[in-house]
UniProtKB/Swiss-Prot annotation:
One cellular-component annotation, GO: respiratory chain complex III
Encoding gene (name): MT-CYB
The entry's keywords: Electron transport, Heme, Iron, Membrane, Metal-binding, Mitochondrion, Mitochondrion inner membrane, Respiratory chain, Transmembrane, Transmembrane helix, Transport, Ubiquinone
Binding annotation for heme b b562: 83, 182
Binding site for a ubiquinone: 201
Compartments, record wording: Mitochondrion inner membrane
Cofactors: heme b
Organism, scientific name: Alexandromys oeconomus
Protein name: Cytochrome b
More about this protein: Heme 1 (or BL or b562) is low-potential and absorbs at about 562 nm, and heme 2 (or BH or b566) is high-potential and absorbs at about 566 nm.
Lineage, opening ranks: Eukaryota, Metazoa, Chordata, Craniata, Vertebrata
Example GO molecular function: ubiquinol-cytochrome-c reductase activity
Function: Component of the ubiquinol-cytochrome c reductase complex (complex III or cytochrome b-c1 complex) that is part of the mitochondrial respiratory chain. The b-c1 complex mediates electron transfer from ubiquinol to cytochrome c. Contributes to the generation of a proton gradient across the mitochondrial membrane that is then used for ATP synthesis.
Record keyword Glycoprotein present: no
BP GO terms, sorted: mitochondrial electron transport, ubiquinol to cytochrome c
Membrane topology (UniProt): Multi-pass membrane protein
Length: 380
């Protein structure tokens, strides 16, 4: 078996990536989320494939076809709720994975980090288009509002929006193309994940100390395969509790009303995992400014390697920047809450304050904190 594992062209690649891979001996459970994201992607592709077998991407039958899946298809309700809540689990793992990268300075592996940002955008695009497919009220109005933001682009905006819609409003053509893109994107994401891993294995994993771990490596299997398996069990348990006991807790009740272009819901809002970005978008009165802030709220991650001023890589031994980091986490939770609230006092001013704080912490406060910590270390 050892000979095949090390000699066979295909198995050799798997061996170098998941079995004989040298890994730092001290990586904590925060390093589990990469494998959990891979699992989430697999769950989404498999459940999505079965849903696509029964779904029809036509405005007249889309809503009914989803109801048909839940009522008439064997275990269709389970497949549908695993797919819907699987998306939420995907984003929870994504946010924790990115948060880990920011905390431990993993952004210094620039190729891996930038590939991760591309993946984040791709997953967000996929999730957005997937939310449109059931063709409920929030699906329709969410698609209308978010695609309409592109009209803020000078000169080509209006033409671009009508080109994406395939007409003068979100309609049959829009739904069909969104289904096509929603189907193909996860496979593109899978290819990007392989590139992400390729870049990661060029440098090797980071670790909680932020120090070079070449002197103390252990094989990935069995140490981290068994550790990842525990994470897998916990993820599946949480997903099944969500899908079986609270299937609609993260959804919007408005999406159980078929799409009606003549009736606008009182509060248009996206799924919970987009609320922080939606709050930043809404906190700027200007349309183009809001769109730019929305894109920057994610793209700012690409600036992190440039904004790194500390002589240390991780935040493990940096209490001042640690404080900034946890304030940033709290700020993101506030933004998520604000994104789901109506546009009125006091939510507007809270959202604007939280948006300013978000960018200020990343661009100004954390780099300054890094320099202060450098000076403290130089005092002797």
């Amino acid at each position: 078996m050892t000979i095949i594992r090390k000699k066979h062209p295909l198995i050799k690649m798997i061996n170098h990536s998941f079995i004989d891979l040298p890994a730092p001996s001290n990586i904590s459970s925060w390093w589990n989320f990469g494998s959990l994201l891979g699992l989430c992607l697999m769950i989404q592709i498999i459940t999505g494939l079965f849903l696509a077998m029964h779904y029809t991407s036509d405005t007249t039958t889309a809503f009914s076809s989803v109801a048909h899946i839940c009522r008439d298809v064997n275990y269709g309700w389970l497949i549908r709720y695993m797919h819907a809540n699987g998306a939420s689990m995907f984003f929870i793992c994504l946010f924790l994975h990115v948060g880990r990268g920011v905390y431990y300075g993993s952004y210094n592996m620039i190729e891996t980090w930038n590939m991760g940002i591309v993946l984040l955008f791709a997953v967000m695009a996929t999730a957005f288009m997937g939310y449109v497919l059931p063709w409920g009220q929030m699906s329709f109005w969410g698609a209308t509002v978010i695609t309409n933001l592109l009209s803020a682009i000078p000169y080509i905006g209006t033409t671009l929006v009508e080109w994406i819609w395939g007409g003068f409003s979100v309609d049959k053509a829009t739904l069909t193309r969104f289904f096509a893109f929603h189907f193909i994107l996860p496979f593109i994401i899978t290819a990007l994940v392989l590139v992400h891993l390729l870049f990661l294995h060029e440098t090797g994993s980071n670790n909680p100390t932020g120090l070079n771990s070449d002197t103390d490596k252990i094989p990935f299997h069995p140490y981290y395969t068994i550790k990842d398996f525990l994470g897998v069990l916990i993820l599946l348990m949480v997903l099944m509790i969500l899908a079986l006991f609270f299937p609609d807790i993260l959804g919007d009740p408005d999406n159980y009303t078929p799409a009606n272009p003549l009736n606008t819901p009182p509060h248009i809002k996206p799924e919970w995992y987009f609320l922080f970005a939606y709050a930043i978008l809404r906190s700027i009165p200007n349309k183009l400014g809001g769109v730019l802030a929305l894109i920057l709220s994610i793209l700012i991650l690409a600036l992190m390697p440039l904004l790194h001023t500390s002589k240390q890589r991780a935040l493990t031994f940096r209490p001042i920047t640690q404080t900034m980091y946890w304030i940033l986490v709290a700020d993101l939770l506030v933004l998520t809450w604000i994104g789901g609230q109506p546009v009125e006092y006091p939510f507007i001013i809270i959202g604007q304050t939280a948006s300013i704080a978000y960018f200020a912490i990343i661009v100004i406060l954390m780099p300054i904190a890094g320099m202060i910590e450098n000076n403290i270390l130089n005092l002797d």
